[in-house]
Amino acid sequence: FQPDLLVALGGGSAMDCAKAMAYFSGTKAPLAAIPTTSGSGSEVTDFAVLTHGQTKYPLVDKRLRPDLAILDSDFLRNLPPALIADTGFDVLTHAIEAYTSSNAGTIPDLLAQEAFRTAYACLPASYAGNTEVRLRLHMASTLAGMAFSQSGLGLCHAMAHVLGARFHIPHGRLNAILLPAVISSNAPAAQQKYARLARAAGLGGSADTIALRNLKNGLIRLRKDLSLPQTLSQAGAAPAQVWAATGEIVEAVLADPCCKTNPASVEDFQIRRVLEEVTGHF
């Protein structure tokens, strides 16, 4: 295996696969990443997520970062609305979790804030078929990737990794379901930063408590506007199956490296509370 160049072309999973292949093969060939969806930011990150059976394995290493990223809006013209909704919420979640990370810093904060502001503004129009805004959303995805590659992510991604592998629900869709509940859970530790993001996106709120509420409600409203499921039950995970596996889910979430940079220390009860909010009714 002695390639002159490796090209990762596709969505987040395809790019992660190519990145892992290059990493484990030990090749010195440069890796060029060309994303065809606006979501993962994998074209600029040190992360790759691999799935084996019912487990997702997040890999983190600087050697996973591609040498070249190419953003071409032509790949976005014919994306189906459902895919735009799923991947777009991944952008929003990357930006929010990077901005509120316990490892956040000035430069990644600037990247994350701009990524969130742009994605929140552009996602509805992109979903509705406006191809002119899709490059802006594409760039927001890359900015969010640059931010979380430095700052890390949080509980929402940790839970999405575990639930996605177990119930085979698309990653971005899970983020959309989980994110408002995770914001409520993390609010005591990150209220001020959530409020800043709300104001950056034009959601207002003179007091931090009001701005945080506006952020959560704005995300719930956007989720509905994009025809995304509101609960795990609506996404196809039967509540009885979720509750039967709760112990295993909690254990796996606590072991996910994304928990290390959550703004608050992640505890067993916190994960259970989020699950209760997002599972849906029997």
Regions found by a protein language model. Give the residues of each.
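Alpha-helix C-terminal capping segments
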Residues: 20-30, 150-152, 162-167, 186
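Glycine-rich phosphate/pyrophosphate-binding beta-alpha loops
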Residues: 39, 142-175, 256-261
